[in-house]
């Protein structure tokens, strides 16, 4: 899976508060483009959209696939993780999504440490309302809980996560940061 190095401390002082994101009208990556590559251009493509989102009071954008605008992809700098009502951990699969070591690590933790079922598959936007939890994952924050998604005025609120991290998201966060901080034994080869 790659190397994970010890963190010096928590990213959020006092805990992570759920964020509110909006469905973007912009596209982050073109079909068959370079969305899966960590390149400056991919971040630059989302700058106008994030400035617009912040001006409208949102923390981040949700990008849908550029070809059909029906499938969840990612934000400008983080991958999505969803939790179903029966505690299955789901993450979107697309050739336009930047592969994330944090996402892979969280999926490994979910399956091998927490005993949860995991799926990497296409996630259709229409099914997002049925998930119990939503989070954004990336290197700095590990997981930022999403409490609400605004789709052009229609709100999707996650029953677990409006006031704090949902229970599965919290277990994922605590377990991965426990591994990073040396409180929980790491898988072979994760920590040097």
Identify the meaning behind each predicted range.
Residues 1-5:
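Short, small-residue-biased leader/transition segments that mark boundaries at the very start
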Residues 6-192:
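Helix-start/capping segments and mature chain N-termini
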């Amino acid at each position: 899976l790659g190397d994970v190095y010890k963190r010096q401390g928590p990213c959020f002082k006092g805990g992570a508060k759920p964020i509110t994101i909006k469905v973007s009208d912009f596209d982050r990556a073109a079909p068959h483009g370079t969305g899966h590559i960590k390149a400056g251009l991919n971040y630059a493509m989302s700058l106008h959209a994030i400035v617009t989102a912040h001006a409208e009071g949102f923390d981040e954008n949700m990008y849908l696939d550029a070809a059909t605008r029906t499938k969840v992809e990612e934000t400008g700098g983080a991958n999505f993780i969803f939790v179903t009502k029966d505690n299955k951990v789901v993450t979107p699969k697309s050739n336009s999504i930047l592969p994330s070591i944090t996402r892979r690590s969280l999926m490994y933790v979910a399956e091998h440490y927490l005993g949860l079922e995991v799926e990497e598959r296409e996630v259709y936007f229409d099914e997002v309302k049925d998930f119990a939890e939503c989070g954004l994952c990336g290197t700095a924050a590990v997981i930022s809980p999403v409490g609400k998604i605004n789709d052009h005025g229609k709100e999707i609120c996650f029953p677990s996560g409006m006031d704090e991290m949902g229970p599965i998201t919290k277990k994922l966060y605590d377990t991965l940061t426990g591994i990073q901080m040396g409180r929980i034994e790491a898988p072979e080869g994760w920590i040097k």
